Amino acid sequence: MLNTTKNQTNTKTQIQRGKSRRQPFLVMDNVYKVYPNGYRALENVNLNVAEGEFIALIGHSGCGKSTLLNMVSGFSHPSQGTVSINGQRITKPGPDRMVVFQGYALLPWRTVFENVYLAVNAVFPNKSKVEKNAIVKEHLAMVGLTEAAEKRPPQISGGMKQRVSIARALAIRPKVLILDEPFGALDAITKEELQEELLKIWNDHRCTVLMITHDIDEALFLADRLVMMTNGPSATIGEVLEIPFPRPRDRVQMMEDPEYYNLRNYALDFLFRRFAHDHDA
């Protein structure tokens, strides 16, 4: 019989170190969300995120992950508690926070270049056209879409559309990039390619990232910490798992490390335990 006691102990040691030791930049302080019909989506959510940190959130559907990110985006507000960036309470959407959804949200009648340019023009109206064009070209090159600049969304693949969405979000230089299952609809190979590209881009920009995912392998490859949500209603942060692998990360090397599977199995066990508990109740 396989002895997992030692592995679980090691993994729990990582969880105990799951609190960021750097200066808080994005702060969720005693956050509750109750809807007008009385449904309590979130309660007592507390999380400090350092500037430039990459955070992944996992949990079952309906556990309030998107609700939490909507409050960071400014699309929604806490019923109690505060969400703040750099000491400033978030009260509305702003260009310092950009969202990339699973759906691409591109204008199909506009070219790839124009889809990015419209965002740049809206945020930097005082820059010259030459400067704005340069920003668009730089970010399209960053995601490997220089040759597709004059194509329209119906003419490109799903993976390319998501690259456009990421380029558009980063082109306005946000402080926080919010990713709501951005690769969930893509095939496995395209997903891995975009994960690699996202890490390279993040390493260059070093903006703060909050990412929702249902893919534990994706979370372990990309993130600094894994925030695991309990089931709703009244969902909260169950545990925070620190991901110890050094950067830059190599997927093959990570998957050869026994600690990778310790962490992966711990996260899976957390999700299974939550699911079983709800169904037994």
What label would you give each PLM region?
Residues 81-93:
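Conserved ABC transporter NBD signature motif
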Residues 128-148, 200:
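Conserved ABC ATPase "signature" region
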Residues 58-60:
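The feature captures the beta-strand-to-loop junction immediately N-terminal to the Walker
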Residues 171-175:
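A short, proline-enriched helix->beta-strand linker immediately N-terminal to the Walker B motif
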Residues 73:
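Helix-to-loop junction immediately C-terminal to a conserved catalytic motif
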Residues 152-156, 160:
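Conserved ABC ATPase signature
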Residues 113-121, 133, 137:
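Short helical segment in ABC ATPase nucleotide-binding domains corresponding to the A-loop/adjacent helical element
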